[in-house]
Design a protein with these regions (language model features):
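Short secondary-structure transition/capping segments
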Residues: 7-12, 98-101, 170-173, 208-210, ...
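Short secondary-structure boundary segments
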Residues: 1-3, 90, 162, 223
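Glycine-rich, positively charged N-terminal anion/phosphate-binding segment
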Residues: 1-78
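Alpha/beta catalytic cores of nucleotide-metabolism and tRNA/nucleoside-modifying enzymes
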Residues: 117-120, 125-127, 139-157, 181-197, ...
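Short, solvent-exposed helix-helix connector turns and helix-capping sites enriched
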Residues: 9-13, 24, 29, 109-112, ...
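Alpha/beta enzyme core
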Residues: 70-195, 213-214
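Conserved strand-turn element in the central/C-terminal portion of the radical SAM core barrel
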Residues: 54-68, 128-139, 196-199, 203
């Protein structure tokens, strides 16, 4: 999941597991660090983040942004007991990243020595993998060369969002996936650094197409996951509960309509009460509502959820909604046995 500095709750990240923080926020605003640590600890302990068949726990990656190598090291060290990897954000296109000199505004060639020093310092100081996320540089050759230099500096994974940095049109047009393939080729067949492709994935069917074209080792998805958090698990309407009911963390009533991501998300909000503002929860719900077919019933549900004042009321509305029951029923119908 593509991270954001603001607007992600633990419950949204429980489908995927990455969050971005500015190094200065972690070092100089203890409340921010303590909140981040609580969310990571809760995420690590959450039963939903553990595969009941293999016992494997989903990894949690902390993404940091900034422009000072020493601050990166200090901030990363604070997360080492709980993070499975540290990611360097070199892709944020927003105006605050430009004003703060971080994210995608460090991609100019003059900044490359600084980026190498940051990655090298993190690799030297941390005993977890160090990864990087970038966007396209001014030219294709610059993108490939920067990828090579980050790999040599120690980046275990490079995620390329195949669009240029633009604060006002940051997702305009299709991503230029040919440059992901170019980066893979530039790193070579014997590369140790893995490449993730970011862009042009809006459904499960897009994933194998993307990987076949780019030759990437995996994909990262951003905003489409806000609409459909189950994008990476098609037709998996609580398959764990269906096949392993004794081990499932959810009760029968909780799983009844678990094919709806809205019900799943609100159930997790209820089960893991952290200090996420209602405005943030509402924002996630409204994003998921965009995935429902338009109708009077959908509009009525949209308005009712928007006007609800607490998670319990929203969850009751969602569980009793015929619109979401139909959505879940369609998922269960398609679920392979």
């Amino acid at each position: 999941m593509e991270p954001q500095r603001r607007g992600r709750t633990l419950h949204a990240r429980s489908y995927v597991h990455r969050q971005m923080y500015h190094t200065e926020d972690i070092l100089y605003h203890n409340e921010t660090y303590e909140k981040a640590l609580r969310a990571l600890e809760m995420g690590r302990a959450a039963r939903e983040n553990c595969d009941i068949v293999t016992g494997e726990r989903a990894p949690q990656i902390v993404q940091l942004a900034g422009d000072d190598p020493e601050q990166f090291v200090q901030a990363a060290r604070r997360f080492l007991p709980i993070a499975d990897a540290i990611d360097l954000n070199l892709g944020c296109p927003q105006a605050r990243a430009r004003d703060g000199h971080y994210g995608g505004y460090l991609l100019k060639r003059r900044e490359w020595p600084l980026l190498e020093r940051i990655v090298q310092a993190l690799c030297k100081s941390c005993d977890v993998p160090i990864t990087t996320k970038i966007r396209l540089c001014d030219t294709a050759s610059d993108t490939y060369e920067l990828g090579q230099r980050l790999a040599l500096a120690g980046s275990s994974v490079i995620t390329l969002h195949a669009r240029h940095v633009a604060p006002n049109r940051r997702r305009a047009g299709m991503a230029k996936l040919e440059h992901v393939r170019g980066l893979v080729d530039a790193l070579g067949a014997e590369r140790r650094t893995r490449v993730l492709s970011n862009g042009n994935v809006r459904s499960w069917a897009d994933i194998p197409t993307n990987m076949a074209y780019t030759h990437a080792d995996g994909v990262m998805v951003g905003e489409p996951l806000l609409v459909n958090p189950d994008l990476f698990a098609p037709s998996a309407a609580c398959s764990h509960h269906q096949h392993y009911p004794a081990q499932c963390a959810l009760s029968d009533s909780q799983c009844q309509w678990s094919g709806s991501p809205i019900v799943t998300y609100l159930s997790m909000c209820e089960r893991y009460p952290i200090d996420a503002p209602m405005s943030c929860i509402q924002q996630h719900i409204q994003s998921m509502m965009r995935g429902l077919p338009p109708s009077r019933e959908t509009r009525a549900l949209h308005d009712a959820l928007r006007d609800a004042g607490d998670v319990q009321t929203m969850l009751h509305l969602a569980r009793s909604s015929s619109v979401l029951q139909l959505q879940a029923g369609a998922v269960h119908k398609d679920d392979p046995k």
